[in-house]
């Protein structure tokens, strides 16, 4: 399972750890992903999405029905 938010598309990005001496070592910044069940009132069922914390806020703002319509338009499975 890839580390990508299904709602926002957030994915890991590369960067550096910096020590006190400013030595740079490569690292990855991972999105804050959670598998979360959302109740879809129109379909009378739960839908499980892998979303970031920001994705959950987007769902709270727009509503799950609108977000699922966007996912369907992109051709993404859920």
Swiss-Prot record:
Disulfide-linked positions: none
A Pfam match: Ribosomal_L28
Keyword hit for Ribonucleoprotein: yes
GO cellular component: cytosolic large ribosomal subunit
Keywords for the protein's UniProt record, in alphabetical order: Ribonucleoprotein, Ribosomal protein
GO molecular function terms attached to this record: structural constituent of ribosome
Keyword Ribosomal protein: yes
TM annotation in the entry: none
Classification via InterPro entries: Ribosomal_bL28, Ribosomal_bL28/bL31-like_sf, Ribosomal_bL28_bact-type, Ribosomal_bL28_sf
GO biological process: translation
Family per similarity comment: Belongs to the bacterial ribosomal protein bL28 family.
Protein name: Large ribosomal subunit protein bL28
Highest classification ranks of the organism: Bacteria, Pseudomonadati, Pseudomonadota, Gammaproteobacteria, Enterobacterales
């Amino acid at each position: 399972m890839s580390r990508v938010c299904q709602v926002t598309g957030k994915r890991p990005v590369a960067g550096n750890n910096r020590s006190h001496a400013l030595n740079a070592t490569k690292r990855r910044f991972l999105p804050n992903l959670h598998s979360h069940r959302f109740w879809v009132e129109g379909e009378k069922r739960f839908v499980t999405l892998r979303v970031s914390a920001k994705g959950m806020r987007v769902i709270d703002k727009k509503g799950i029905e609108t977000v699922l319509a966007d996912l369907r338009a992109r051709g993404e499975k859920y």
